[in-house]
Regions:
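Lipid deacylating catalytic domains
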Residues: 1-39, 43-154
């Protein structure tokens, strides 16, 4: 249980200071040579989704999330930028959402954001149990292959 406590602190900090965090991320994305691919793991996926759905970010050609709770936060109406029942603005698509059934902090997006084109869930299986599965994405070659396969052309 102790290993999850820093994550809870991060989420609480983001809930309190999310505007400044999103502002810093938007500054990092601004002026980048296209294509721009934004990659977020766990809370980073929430930050990116909040940023992109609020219309505060420069254009992003592909959103990649791994082990993200964004779909859960949307389903329980806890995202800061878009409310359950509202139309979700599409500037964050295409969205490649990578999840792992062993990762209890990872959620599918296609069903939760039903009716929005451009969202693709892809499952990986690094074959490690939770909680190690939550950090295992970056040790799985399939994750990098999925990003390569979805990299924007042009």
């Amino acid at each position: 249980m102790n290993s999850s406590l820093p994550g809870i602190g991060d989420i609480l900090f983001y809930q309190r200071r999310g505007d400044r965090i999103r502002e810093l991320v938007a500054e990092r994305l601004a002026g980048r040579q296209r294509p721009v691919v934004a990659v977020g793991h766990s809370l980073g996926g929430i930050v990116l989704l909040d940023l992109l759905t609020a219309g505060q970010a420069p254009p992003v050609d592909l959103l990649v999330t791994a082990g993200s709770q964004s779909p859960l936060f949307f389903a329980i109406d806890a995202l800061g930028s878009v409310r359950l029942g509202q139309d979700v603005p599409p500037p964050f698509t295409p969205w490649l959402n990578i999840y792992n059934r062993q990762d209890l902090l990872s959620f599918c997006a296609e069903r939760v954001f039903a009716g929005i084109d451009g969202i693709q869930d892809q499952e990986v299986d690094p074959k490690v149990p939770f909680p190690a599965s939550h950090s295992a994405y970056w040790h799985d070659d399939k994750v990098y292959q999925l990003i390569r396969d979805n990299w924007p052309r042009g």
